[in-house]
Structure formats: C-alpha cells, structure tokens
Amino acid sequence: MTIDEGKLQILAAFCELAWADGRVTQAQADFISDLAIEMDVRLGSYLPVLVMGLSRPPRAKVENLADIPIDEVERFQLVERFVAMCLLHEGLSNEQADVLARLALQLGINARELEEMRRRLC
C-alpha cells in the first residue's frame, strides 16, 4: 500500500468511526475534513471519500490499517486522533468504543494504551 492509499484508508476509518453511533455530527465532519487538508491529500482524491463517507454509513469495515506504511509514533498519533474525534460530543458511545478498539488493534495499540489515551485527552 502506498502512503497516498494509506491516507485514504485513514480517512475512511475516521468516517467509519464517526458513523459508529448511527450519525455524523457537524463537529466530526469538520474534524475529518480538516484532517484531510492537514494530511496533504489531494482534493480530487479525498473529496469522493469524504462525500461518500460522511453522507451514508460505510458498507464495509476498514480492516487494513496495519498495511499503511507509518511508524510506531505515527500509529499512536493516529489513534490519539481517533480518540479525540470520539470525544467531540457527549462522550464515547459503546458503538464507537467497539469500532475504536478494532481500529486501534489494527495499529498495534492495546486496550490499556487506548484507555491511557482516553484519560489523557479528557
């Protein structure tokens, strides 16, 4: 997987996480949109991902985050961003917690590390 393909998978994972509790808030949509710009993804590449990902629930789960060519520090930073997005509104729903745990495990982050991130970001 190339780094550009990986960036699109990361955006898809954020969209899946946003939909975990059945709806995407404006704050989550803004968070993901800002992230796409920050990641320096070409507009023509990420716009279709965002339009599809934010307009309806994903058809398939993101299962290949481990294949993205990023180092350990970047993996931790990515999961911290997942957690930060989940905490934008009322808190972490059970559905979001399940998706978050699955995505974090793909990136080599265990439950203890994930809980430490959540506490640090609260």
Predicted regions and their residues:
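Small-residue-enriched hydrophobic alpha-helices in membranes
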Residues: 1-122
